[in-house]
């Protein structure tokens, strides 16, 4: 056998033996918790029409999609993320179903990143979607589900960092930034690149008040106490409502007895445009 046929391409790997057994065990434990919360399994295709993952929907950039054509000439793409596929499926089959809808999923996703980035191009994604309920209680449910799922795997020391994209968007609107500038600034702040952010704001001649608040967003993280100050700094209703929403979610999580696992980070701004409200991650 030729030597090169024994190796995998850059960005993919074999999983076997004890590592694979451990992976299956963790997936099972997380799925048990999803089921206990009433989330139903859903399976979407490994590839879809390209437009499902198009830039307008706000998922992975086109250059990072694995694209190909079928015999009819349709442009198809391997899924880089489950959320757009689940949203499409819900819109097709569940429009007349009573809200909210609860789905959970497990499968591999594919992103054609540069080999120099050192990232896996095929990863397993497991998640849950709560559709049709925009309340603070729904936000708290998903955060609670994440906490309880991690605890169910045996983890004890972790934190859930919670952000609110609307806080940033409100200040950008108030400062009169266009969509392109907002998108670039979002990337700078997400990467904690304050020099790039400040240079951009100076080029756009943003007034001193808004510039100072936008530059501070990257450093706005911590416990519940700093949210009040963040609300005062924002001179617009949209941003203040975002802070109020975070406080409401925290109140619900406190009732669940989960407040010790929660912190806040207003500089956490997802590159996915379909995340318009609360976002969170564990570390």
Please place each PLM-identified region on the residue numbering.
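Catalytic cores of Mg2+-dependent Asp-rich isoprenoid enzymes
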Residues: 11, 51-57
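Short terminal or interdomain "cap/linker" segment that borders an active site or interface and mediates
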Residues: 160, 165-202
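A short beta-strand-loop structural module common to alpha/beta enzyme folds
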Residues: 40-46
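Positively charged, Gly/Ser-enriched RNA/tRNA-binding surfaces
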Residues: 20-37, 48-51, 62, 68, ...
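A positional/architectural concept
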Residues: 41, 75-79
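Auxiliary tRNA-acceptor-end handling modules of aminoacyl-tRNA synthetases
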Residues: 1-19
